[in-house]
Amino acid sequence: LQKQDISTFALDRMTELQLLDEAAQIPADFNAAEYFRDAIGITAFKGEALRIVLKADTIAARYIETQAFHHSQKLLDKQDAFSIFELRILVTEEFIRSLLGYAGEVEVLEPESLRLTLKERAQALIKRYQS
């Protein structure tokens, strides 16, 4: 961790604090709203937000419509059996775990890199339960 990096910490996980003589220096141009604009949760990093396209079964789609993943989320198509959503975010572990929570009810259509990540996680899950 470089001293110039922005870090976030979960206060509920802290067990001890130590007061130091050294003070943190917040860059004069730092804008928290801008920094976290493309993030889900508290995890953010310097990087390009990706266009994510999801296909959700009817029940999952209803939930995703009312409990959006992110403020950039848009409904692109709504059919009887599924809906297609688009959002632009930084792909984080928090987002991946959110998708995994939908099990087989949500499919990542784009980007291919995220599809591959979820495929690998699903294969690991199957392997764990086969033994």
List each model region and its residues.
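Polybasic (Lys/Arg-rich)
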Residues: 37-131
